[in-house]
Swiss-Prot record:
Organism annotation: Homo sapiens (Human)
Protein name (record): Apoptosis-resistant E3 ubiquitin protein ligase 1
PTM section of the record: Autoubiquitinated in vitro in the presence of E2 enzyme UBE2D1/UBCH5A.
E.C. number: 2.3.2.26
GO biological process: one example: protein K33-linked ubiquitination
Gene: AREL1
Length: 823
């Protein structure tokens, strides 16, 4: 009986296995017959299907080289294991139609990948490498011949990296806070990683003790300074990626604070604090809420030419009425001998004055015979006007305040109500700039106010008929009689002899072409300080006679038009296609010239003369306060004195900084004074100068010209690859472009800086680089890349893997821009 039951069981099992085999065989035959794609079927026969001797996506596997979750910024890899249907390894070197697609789920950003077939004994494995910069959830789709590999698509989460102090910021940052004694104030901090991801996975939010706050009082000498009494508590919110620092000070006065993360200052973590009593706070609030009325404070004025507390060491830049800059009523005081700037002693008897603070300006006045007001100094209420807080003055023992706007000499005042005066100014400033000093908040305020300025002017269409062959001349003629209201309208551009209707395309093209016509150096309205076509452009003091000053007014109006159009948003957004010198941008917002502008505007002059003077002893050099000017043939034309009697005043170690600043004033500003004045005249017709004044020169460039995003496709289209073996051209270059495609804009700018010496492209992009961007096959292996910036050459060694290319390129561009040798 036992044998009978066993035989029946074996028969049943054999029957089921036979049925399973027949069903599988039938399925393979049907699959073969239904598959009409000859490319997918290849040379396979029905016998291959019967044996399972074909690549089956569902039999393939994917293995991951990392454990979840993982941080962004690393070179990641996974492996696709290819198998026949019958479970045998499938040789990966055969064409299999493997397609890998990786994208950020929320941002819909595609990630470039590289594929590499491994050698024996893993010849059935394809290694896929990639790098992600943005934290979040990613979808990874792996397909073979259009069919998903088993369990594809996959979903992986990449976490933010560790906190980087230089990327971490205070939300709604102010350079000076006005607080009330004993009342808490909360600062919101957003921790960010190296790639600007808000981070919540590190100890930045788990251990609040990483955030430290140091505060010291401004004014007293170190030996007189006492400890500042304050309370600090730190909490966090993992959902909003924020840290909250709650601060309470218990003593009145002016202080300087610094917030650090792991003993490293965060991005905007340094600021001043004015602490008022409850009564003082009420006075300040009443002062600020009183619109249209100047609040005055009694003070004492010390020697205005005492420049010991400022690094500028430069007399004031004389401004014209068209620029409407702050000026003094007593010109004789502004033109004191420069040597007085080096006299640190105060005058024996300070002058009694009155300081008036209004929503728009801060002025210092003196009263003759106690009834006749005489304005001595006027400063704008804007971020460019800086306050420094010192201790009691030696005469009246009143707290001292130094006011410096970068235009006039610093003014030193002592005042019984110094803290109330400063707090009134700061609160008025905060109202003027929209309540925050962060760049984006200032941009939003600027655009909102600019729209308000032109609100009553209609944005209806006005036709602009121009000739493509004489664009500048025809554009000048078409706008010759335009009023400010006309410039505020929506331009409908019509090119002569062309039938295209302007739905936005011709208008954008006109802006592009007219910017090139005005700011391209070939037209000689603007120039460069060197022959490098990547150099910044500056008004041309030696322009041809036919280029009248009216053209600078037109250029100013065009820039103002672009700013106004951008404030409207959407399709109206229009950037200025130019790269201006820092010194020219500084003059637009009324800043004084400084020798450090040479470093960006005229690098060759900075390296050859400025650095030489800074780094050498001047006692043996026969250098005077004068500049020799040569004509085009190289002959001495004239000698220009940088100050009265400059030709007889030697440059010494003590006054060489003063000399360099005067040299900057002459070369960068005085020579183009008329050009800048006319440019500002046109610009300020459309954009009030008080709105521009809320930005510094770097922010102004971003506002006008944008970030200048670097296009990887443009890079790849115009880069020239020179030399190299098959391995270099087919593998290393493929890895290189994958790495480049994964870089952030900041990293791309560093790569451009590393190779060309400039972090920005000319307006024409990579196509305009001269010489072209070249990638040279270096005769080395596994070393750091090097660069020849004079020739725009990147020397790239050979590497063994994508990970090695990624690591070496990252190391090169992060360490600096001087080029690197072998490790």
């Amino acid at each position: 009986m036992f044998y009978v039951i066993g035989g029946i069981t074996v028969s049943v099992v054999a029957f089921f296995f036979t049925i399973k085999f027949l069903f599988e065989l039938a399925a393979r035959v049907v699959s073969f017959l239904q598959n009409e794609d000859r490319e997918r079927r290849g040379d396979r026969t029905i016998y291959d299907y019967v044996r399972g001797n074909y690549l089956d996506p569902r039999s393939c596997k994917v293995s991951w080289d990392w454990k979840d979750p993982y941080e962004v910024g690393h070179s990641m890899a996974f492996r696709v294991h290819l198998f026949y249907k019958n479970g045998q390894p499938f040789p990966a070197h055969r064409p299999v139609g493997l397609r890998v697609h990786i994208s950020h789920v929320e941002l819909a950003v595609e990630i470039p990948v590289t594929q590499e077939v491994l050698q024996e004994p893993n010849s059935n494995v394809v290694k896929v490498a990639f790098t992600v910069r943005k934290a979040g959830r990613y979808e990874i789709t792996v397909k073979l011949g259009g069919l998903n590999v088993a369990y594809s698509p996959y979903y992986k989460i990449f976490q933010p990296g560790m906190v980087v102090p230089s990327k971490t910021k205070i939300v709604c940052h102010f350079s000076t806070l006005v607080l009330t004694c004993g009342q808490p104030h909360t600062l919101q901090i957003v921790p960010r990683d190296e790639y600007d991801n808000p981070t919540n996975n590190s100890m930045s939010l788990r251990d609040e003790h990483n955030y430290t706050l140091s505060i010291h009082e401004l004014g007293p000498q170190e030996e007189e300074s006492t400890g500042v009494s304050f309370e600090k508590s730190v909490t966090s919110n993992r959902q909003t990626f924020q840290v909250f620092l709650r601060l309470t000070l218990h003593s009145r006065g002016c202080f300087h604070a610094c917030i650090s993360y792991q003993n490293q200052p965060i991005n905007n973590g340094e600021f001043d604090i004015i602490v008022l009593s409850e009564d003082e706070k009420n006075i300040v609030e009443r002062n600020v809420s009183t619109s249209g009325v100047s609040i005055y404070f009694e003070a004492y004025l010390y020697n205005a030419t005492n420049c010991s507390s400022t690094p500028w060491h430069l007399p004031p830049m004389h401004m014209t009425s068209s620029q409407r800059r702050p000026s003094t009523a007593v010109d004789e005081e502004d033109e004191d001998s420069p040597s007085e700037c080096h006299t640190p002693e105060k005058v024996k008897k300070p002058k009694k004055v009155y300081c008036y603070v209004s929503p728009k300006q801060f002025s210092v006045k003196e009263f003759y015979l106690k009834i006749i007001p005489w304005r001595l100094y006027t400063f704008r209420v804007c971020p460019g006007t800086k306050f420094s807080y010192l201790g009691p003055d030696p005469v009246h023992k009143l707290l001292t305040l130094v006011v410096d706007d970068g235009i006039q000499p610093p003014v030193e005042l002592s005042c019984k109500e110094r803290n109330i005066l400063a707090a009134t100014f700061i609160r008025s400033l905060h109202k003027n700039i929209g309540g925050s000093e962060t760049f984006q908040d200032k941009v939003n305020f600027f655009q909102r106010e600019l729209r308000q300025v032109h609100m009553k002017r209609p944005h209806s269409k006005v036709t602009l008929k121009v000739s493509r062959h004489a664009l500048l001349e025809s554009s000048l003629k078409a706008t010759r009689n335009f009023s400010i209201s006309d410039w505020s309208k929506n331009f409908e551009v019509v090119f002569q002899d062309e039938e295209a209707l302007d739905w936005g395309g011709p208008r954008r093209e006109w802006f592009e072409l007219i910017c090139k016509a005005l700011f391209d150096t070939t037209n000689q309205l603007f120039t460069r300080f060197s022959d490098n076509n990547q150099a910044l452009v500056h008004p041309n003091p030696n322009r041809p006679a036919h280029l009248r000053l009216k053209m600078y007014e037109f250029a100013g109006r065009l820039v103002g038009k672009c700013l106004y159009e951008s404030s409207l948003g959407g399709a109206y957004k229009q950037l200025v296609r130019a790269r201006f010198t820092r010194s020219f941008l500084a003059q637009i917002i009324g800043l004084r010239m400084h020798y450090k502008y040479f470093e960006t505007d005229d690098p060759e002059f900075y390296k050859s003369k400025v650095c030489f003077i800074l780094n050498n002893d001047m006692s043996e050099m026969e250098l005077v306060f004068a500049e020799e000017k040569y004509n085009k043939s190289g002959q001495l034309d004239k000698v220009v004195e940088l100050m009265t009697g400059g030709a007889q005043t030697p440059v010494t170690n003590a006054n060489k900084i003063f000399y360099l600043n005067l040299l900057a004033q002459y070369r960068l500003a005085s020579q183009v004074k008329e050009e800048v004045e006319h440019f500002l005249k046109g610009l300020n017709e459309l954009v009030p100068e008080n709105l521009l004044a809320i930005f510094d020169e770097n922010e102004l460039e971003l506002l006008m010209c944008g970030t200048g995003d670097i296009s990887v496709s443009d890079f790849k289209a115009h880069a020239v690859v020179v030399g190299g073996s098959w391995h270099f051209r087919e593998k290393v270059m493929r890895w290189f472009w994958t790495v480049v495609s994964s870089l952030t804009q900041e990293e791309l700018a560093r790569l451009l800086q590393f190779t060309t010496g400039s972090s920005q492209l000319p307006p024409g992009g990579f196509a305009a680089l001269c010489p072209s961007f070249q990638i040279i096959a270096a005769p080395t292996h596994s070393t750091l890349p090097t660069a020849h910036t004079c020739f725009n050459q990147l020397c790239l060694p050979t590497y063994d893997s994508y990970e090695e290319v990624h690591r070496m390129l990252q190391l090169a561009i992060s360490e600096g821009c001087e080029g690197f040798g072998m490790l």
